[in-house]
Swiss-Prot record:
<keyword id="KW-0963">Cytoplasm</keyword>
<dbReference type="GO" id="GO:0005524">
    <property type="term" value="F:ATP binding"/>
</dbReference>
<dbReference type="InterPro" id="IPR010978">
    <property type="entry name" value="tRNA-bd_arm"/>
</dbReference>
<keyword id="KW-0648">Protein biosynthesis</keyword>
<comment type="similarity">
    <text>Belongs to the class-II aminoacyl-tRNA synthetase family. Type-1 seryl-tRNA synthetase subfamily.</text>
</comment>
<dbReference type="GO" id="GO:0005737">
    <property type="term" value="C:cytoplasm"/>
</dbReference>
<comment type="function">
    <text>Catalyzes the attachment of serine to tRNA(Ser). Is also able to aminoacylate tRNA(Sec) with serine, to form the misacylated tRNA L-seryl-tRNA(Sec), which will be further converted into selenocysteinyl-tRNA(Sec).</text>
</comment>
<keyword id="KW-0436">Ligase</keyword>
<feature type="binding site">
    <location>
        <position position="387"/>
    </location>
    <ligand>
        <name>L-serine</name>
    </ligand>
</feature>
<dbReference type="InterPro" id="IPR033729">
    <property type="entry name" value="SerRS_core"/>
</dbReference>
<feature type="binding site">
    <location>
        <begin position="347"/>
        <end position="350"/>
    </location>
    <ligand>
        <name>ATP</name>
    </ligand>
</feature>
<dbReference type="GO" id="GO:0006434">
    <property type="term" value="P:seryl-tRNA aminoacylation"/>
</dbReference>
<dbReference type="InterPro" id="IPR006195">
    <property type="entry name" value="aa-tRNA-synth_II"/>
</dbReference>
<feature type="binding site">
    <location>
        <position position="283"/>
    </location>
    <ligand>
        <name>L-serine</name>
    </ligand>
</feature>
<keyword id="KW-0030">Aminoacyl-tRNA synthetase</keyword>
<dbReference type="InterPro" id="IPR015866">
    <property type="entry name" value="Ser-tRNA-synth_1_N"/>
</dbReference>
<feature type="binding site">
    <location>
        <begin position="230"/>
        <end position="232"/>
    </location>
    <ligand>
        <name>L-serine</name>
    </ligand>
</feature>
Amino acid sequence: MIDVKDLIEQPEKYRASQEARGEDASLVDRVVEADAARRSSIAGFEQLRAEQKAFGKRVAQAKGEEKQALLAEVKDLAARVKEAESAAGAAEARLAELQRAFPNLIVDGVPAGGEDDFVVLKEVGTPRDFAAEGFEPRDHLELGELLGAIDMERGAKVSGARFSFLTGVGARLELALMQLGLDLALENGFVPVIPPTLVRPETMQGTGFDVEHDDEIYRLERDDLYLVGTSEVALAGFHAGEIMDVSAPVRYAGWSTCYRREAGSAGKDTRGIIRVHQFNKLEMFIYAAQEDAEAEHARLLAWEERMLGAIEVPYRVIDIAAGDLGLSAARKFDCEAWVPTQGTYRELTSTSNCTTFQARRLNIRERVRTEDGSKGGTRMVATLNGTLATTRWIVAILENHQNADGSVTVPAALRPYLGGMERFELV
């Protein structure tokens, strides 16, 4: 949620952000107008309440016919107070509605444009030349079936399309990835968390998801709970309504199953486990002071790159364009791994700086210290998130490390988590 006071003081900054996102810049003016209407209606209500209190004293002192006349006026004034209170409430609600609809203010340097307007920041590693090696690469599903690692057919039988079983070395590989990521997180001061995967609507909305109109979210109607698409949601709600100490960043690593309906993905990635309804993910989540947010964002990206380096796959880092950031992010970097059979890069990780957007929605603050060290007021913290490992990484590992016979060489960094196994053999 945006800072309305800041928008009123610097409207052009918010107009520029909206334009970079390809969104309606006139929303800025509507917020300004709604805030003015709110202030005016509250002032009108408070003035009438003051008159009502003063009038009450006159009535108490009056007698006889004068008192009867004043009582009639009191009734009329009470009706006007009630009407003014209702108007003030409606004005507050209108401003809150606009405030919730307003995307986060992008940070300086974010490229303008939509999904295809990202900027490639770096490419690391060189894709293998399978033709020079003398064989045609198999895709991850064919490899997974040869290795007894992925079973889409039984996944569909049990649960429907876009579900799978990870079996044998497939299950072990995912667990190894998660443990490698968790060890990296522990090394860097993260607290491991296994969070709930069902959350209340206010928690989902607090992180920037629209529970009323987002077709990607699974809902349990009977209980009014939502299945999370990332542990970011539960971790963001962890400190909702609290005043935190973020003199040093507070870092959590959440390991959870995630669920996405993939409602807008008909016909896309129908083969294999690139786009599924259920997957596991290790997510980094950070609460930080506002001035530390950009540095923490850079660290999140660096940790993601360390993981990608550890699994030895070619990858690139892209700076996501403003129009593809989503509601909460002020800046987002994606790391995409090379997928040989598709001849392109596919997203494996994403890291977002949400500045104070989520904290404002969830009312998460820090205590401000004055120069002499005494307690001052409070202000919003910044929140950030980033992926350390997820089921989709299996795609990149299998395809990039395959051998001509269908076996797969295990990246050295994962071998300690697989009992020293150096190769996945055909079953």
